[in-house]
């Protein structure tokens, strides 16, 4: 079974780096359906994410940026906040344009696969890896796989009473 990790866990792995190194390896990743990671460099005015790839650049069109963008259940701020952070994606296509590799990528496809093959199979009481993405007075938002958000309410964080989630967690922490 394929493993689904919070964003940022795959970016420096040898397997991820190898699959991003050339046009040929990107095409092989597209064929195999591999989920890869790279850093989002820019969010354009149309909210497309431009991703830095070792062999060129990738483009995640706005409607491929996250589950729920098309139907409005996810707001555009979810894309804008990904700038300068690792994002997961699947390669849709890759080609040479003007001597440089340009790849069309889909973060939504990676998230949909994560939901179908991982999240939908979780049961109450399962312990899963997560990365803390944001702290609020009422709880901690975490990435539970491929950038999919979840909330840990403050009353579920500790046996003893705490005044703020920062008493237990830090942003970026793997839990």
Residue ranges of each PLM-predicted region?
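Single-stranded RNA-binding regions, centering on S1/OB-family and related RNA-binding modules
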Residues: 1-175
């Amino acid at each position: 079974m394929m493993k689904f990790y919070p964003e940022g866990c795959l970016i420096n792995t040898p397997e991820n780096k190898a699959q991003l190194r050339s046009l040929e390896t990107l095409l092989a990743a597209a064929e195999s359906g591999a989920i890869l990671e790279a850093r989002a460099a820019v969010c354009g005015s149309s909210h497309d994410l431009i991703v830095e790839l070792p062999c060129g650049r990738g483009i995640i069109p706005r409607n491929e940026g996250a589950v729920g963008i098309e139907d409005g259940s996810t707001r555009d701020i979810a894309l804008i906040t990904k700038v300068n952070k690792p994002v997961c994606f699947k390669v849709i296509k890759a080609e040479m344009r003007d001597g440089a590799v340009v790849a069309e990528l889909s973060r939504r496809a990676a998230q949909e696969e994560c939901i179908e093959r991982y999240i939908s199979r979780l049961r109450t009481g399962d312990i899963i890896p997560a990365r803390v993405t944001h702290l609020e007075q009422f709880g901690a938002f975490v990435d539970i796989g491929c950038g999919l958000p979840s909330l840990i309410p403050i009353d579920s964080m500790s046996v003893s009473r705490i005044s703020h989630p920062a008493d237990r967690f830090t942003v970026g922490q793997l839990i």
